[in-house]
């Protein structure tokens, strides 16, 4: 489309990501674990600072972005890493005491401030991601399966109450999810355009920069949340299968590394 601003931002983010990967490879995770309390506090500060007017930027109904000049930074993305590093240490200290509600309450209390700050933004999507991270870590730590079932039941029963406190745009997204074929719902426009893009790509796609949905801006937020639809339109099912394969390889490698960890914290 002639707009290279996203190319610049994505390239800058890519370079920063490479430096972070190199840094992580050079630092022993046990060294980071020694500073889990500091990381815990820093994580909360990063989520809280964007709630201050004039510092945090609002997008899509949520104040979750920090403007750093040429690069907009979503603090929750960094917090995902620092939270895992700090929370893993907390879970490790109680890994043999996760069999009853009484045992799990102290561990959950550590996570509540994070979920509270995310709801305050309000960023329901990221809050759900954090909830899944917490659940996954507790499950890995040996949380009793019957206790997991009870927690799921409590969450399901609480859904109507949670819905009452949701922001209007969040309710709109849920309504769109429950009624995906209703074109009158604003939240369905992007999903429908992405389905058109993927469907029109066929097996091999229309070719790079030849997608009508993406190049003519029918598909919003195509550079981030809906990049997969662009891949489907321009590279077809072959391109999508390749991307899914990369994710599968990445996940397999992650699980292998976790199983090879020398201690519970590394897992």
What are these regions (language model features)?
Residues 190-209:
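Extracytosolic (periplasmic/ER-lumenal) interhelical loops and adjacent juxtamembrane/interface segments
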Residues 203-235, 258-261, 265:
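Long extracytoplasmic/lumenal interhelical loops at the membrane interface
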